[in-house]
Amino acid sequence: MEELIVIYDKEKRDRGRDSYIRAIKKQIPGVRVADVANLPEVGRSKLLILKPMNDGDYETLKTFLKCNPGRDIEGIGSGKLTITAEAIIRVIGPVDKKTVVIINQSDVLGRPLAKELIERGANVISLNSSYPCLDNLLTMTDIDILVSASGQGDFELDRELTRMIDVKIDLSNDLEDPIKITSVPTIEVLKDRMKS
């Protein structure tokens, strides 16, 4: 198995990212964790770049991965389905003819997830947390699956808006509804990618 280097920006605080790094260190033997300001020699290692990170540094690393797709374990530079998007798909299962709302339009989660779900036959509504008519959308649309990963600390959806939705995945603590999935098997996806 090739070595994995996880690159992050230690100057940026993020509890979710730090928890993910701890889980990776616990589950993947020999992983190296490096600050973007002090990058090691990467050799032939697989790279996982984690946000939050300075935009300039992130774009530089993303460009490197586009030029070296064999090192891109996440999929941000190579165009593969990203780790979190794949983990969500593993959790929700078949989506043909289902309506899925995604509250996240990032390149790492929202866009690749929406694209893959459409290819699998789902009807997808993709938006961000600032969408002005979200209450109306949630109450007037027959939604089968809601994926919320806003990343906004002040964004919250009342449980009355989501109670009729069968499957709710909440990766940013956005939903007041207690009946939800709050984690997806990202470490398992990462392990599978390390093997291939």
Segments and roles (model prediction):
Residues E3-G30, K80-I165:
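Glycine-rich phosphate/diphosphate-binding loop of Rossmann-like nucleotide-binding domains
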Residues I7-K10, N173-S196:
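Adenosine-phosphate binding glycine-rich loop
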Residues G30-E41, S129:
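A short, well-structured beta->alpha microelement
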Residues G30-V33, I73-G75, V124-S126, K168, ...:
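Conserved beta-strand scaffold positions in the cores of enzyme catalytic domains, especially
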Residues E41-L47, T141-I145:
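Short acidic/histidine-rich motifs immediately flanking catalytic phosphotransfer sites
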Residues V42, G56-T63, Q152-K168:
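Rossmann-fold NAD(P) dinucleotide-binding segment
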Residues I49-E86:
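Glycine/small-residue-rich loop that forms an oxyanion/phosphate-binding "nest" at active or ligand-binding sites
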Residues P52-M53, V147-Q152, S172-N173:
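Short glycine-/small-residue-rich Rossmann-like dinucleotide-binding loops
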